[in-house]
């Protein structure tokens, strides 16, 4: 109550921020007359003066913001016949300040971006504008290029259809580059696998504006970008596991101490499968193994777990579709197909086995990064969206981004009606169809939002039966997305769309539709996130247009069934709601929103938790990539580095074979064998007589230095440095890939440390640091072994870089993918444990009833 009084008197924090920006808008408006009286050439000349002031360091962007915004506004009027509204100027300032501008649908975010883009492109360091798909990247770049070109800027577009590094490099070399989040991220990973600086396509990460920032930085935050290569693991286990999974019976979850019946139970809240004691026994019999959870059968146990998930947690046409005999993921937030993306940890193979299509090879990660860490590399990050306030805390804590809600140019007239809740889905479906018929009879356009392809096809079939013409937009026909959405505001149009398919394309209406009440939005169930629901509502009522939105729910909807249906069901029972009747109440709507807040909080904590782990790997990634970039620099003294590594290798090897502290007792036979094997160099025991430990280390280092110099003396200095650089890079890349595998295994098992009263994150940091030290030593020592062992003829020396690049290119062409969401940290490895012995995790349960599941064996870093 007290807070509400304060807000009424002083306004919210957002109100105060907007008020500050409005003061500067008045200053920009005062310049409008000055610039509109200039000719085109005079306007360009004036802009060039400001650009020179930035390049010379005489002024910074904030000093010239008012004039530049006024010039961009005038340029928009002349080239596009579009004038930036006052609220759009505010949006531009918010973006320039490195914040998120929340602007409602139809408020012209594409035009707003031109203001900070031009201002920040003046430094010559480049500006990136990120969109959610190729269509929007190309459209926005083409539409706004008239402004940019007038002011002397070049514009490039990165598209997934472009296969050439040359095309990408040309786009990045432009002053302003548009593209999708995936392409920007993958180009960064690919650049850090190149063997020379000139082959890299990206330049400095200066300033980026992320359009639909909530979709990219929140919804896809748990989805890593992965470049991966094939493994040699057999796929037969997935076929066996699929057959076993089909024979296992699902039971109902019960509260302890009661034991569940059946072979397994499904935990829908955490999207997990729990195999019962009876299920373990049945699986062991069907597989023909004695202990499913022994280390020898660890992979088989994991494959069974994934097969059960595939059959019980993943629905065809909801979570994935079959296209050309391939399993294609459906993005849960947009309803679009995620081409090229595969579920990780064998889940995709389990789905392929379930659907009886060709099972593709498992892959090993070669390079990866999350969007969270990619976009945090930029010197300045900003974003635009129509829906961000519900996630303001996350934007602030994770990205240090403030969210500023920008007032609409014209007040919103859309009516957002309370939810209607029915007992069953069938009652809800019928009510939705009746409402569509009612609106359609008078010509009012209707947009029906569904949560899955399956649901959209249910409504499609019902509308066909009612003979109501309509369009369906889901992942199966997304190619026509823009056209279907553009027509959704026409008289009599009925459009069914999964989630936010068509986001970024405006639905425009004419005066006749305005008279009918505008576009009618019908949501057929609530999403787990209020933000996604708000995005659906936001399709109506753009730029002051009228519109209506309403959600139709049932107690059988997943959100209500899993997270809060009992309370609402009790209310309906008390009110005596009969079949076919609905309840409409603010109390019920608030109960639904509370269920959503509960889920949003769970997801936020999950993303925050995963980021804490990913930050550890990210610091290591940055260190390795920074070192890799140093190696690519022609001025880097690779020879000095090799000499240093030889010295460290010599000290390390000598220490392994010195049997006492004095150094008087050395196992020379084994030492000589090791040096001969690893460095192709003969050493004599006489060379080390009467020397201290340090002197012996130095002596070995000197011998190896001389041997190395003699070996490489037949090569020219330039050729030698090139060989050293490329081989060193290959060792580094291979060691980094092995390290990523080790880190995956570590993360998989670290969660169970909590059972031993240890903080898993602290343990992860400690052990990952030790792994990183091993990685550094491996790079040093393996590079020495490789440089001593290789033999080249002149032709091979000349072609070494080309060959390395060709092999890398093959790898890259066949292995770019998107990982699936990393929702859970996995479980630890166990040595062979008797079935009835206590589980090593410390839970107090028998091993066969608890955590026995294991990932692949942990490799050993050399």
From Swiss-Prot:
EC number: 7.4.2.8
Co-factor requirement: Zn(2+)
Gene Ontology MF: a single term: protein-exporting ATPase activity
PROSITE patterns (UniProt xref): SECA_MOTOR_DEAD
Catalytic activity: ATP + H2O + cellular proteinSide 1 = ADP + phosphate + cellular proteinSide 2
Cellular component GO terms held in the UniProt record: cell envelope Sec protein transport complex; cytosol; plasma membrane
CDD domains in UniProt: DEXDc_SecA (cd17928), SF2_C_secA (cd18803)
Gene Ontology terms: biological process: intracellular protein transmembrane transport; protein import; protein targeting; protein transport by the Sec complex
Positions annotated to bind Zn(2+): 839, 841, 850-851
Annotated membrane topology: Peripheral membrane protein
Predominant location: membrane
Manner of cofactor binding, per the entry note: May bind 1 zinc ion per subunit.
Signal peptide coordinates: none
PANTHER family referenced in this protein's UniProt entry, alphabetically: CHLOROPLAST PROTEIN-TRANSPORTING ATPASE, SECA INNER MEMBRANE COMPONENT OF SEC PROTEIN SECRETION SYSTEM
Record function comment: Part of the Sec protein translocase complex. Interacts with the SecYEG preprotein conducting channel. Has a central role in coupling the hydrolysis of ATP to the transfer of proteins into and across the cell membrane, serving as an ATP-driven molecular motor driving the stepwise translocation of polypeptide chains across the membrane.
Subunit structure and binding partners: Monomer and homodimer. Part of the essential Sec protein translocation apparatus which comprises SecA, SecYEG and auxiliary proteins SecDF-YajC and YidC.
Family in the record: Belongs to the SecA family.
Name the record gives this protein: Protein translocase subunit SecA
Organism: Campylobacter jejuni subsp. jejuni serotype O:6 (strain 81116 / NCTC 11828)
Designated gene of the protein: secA
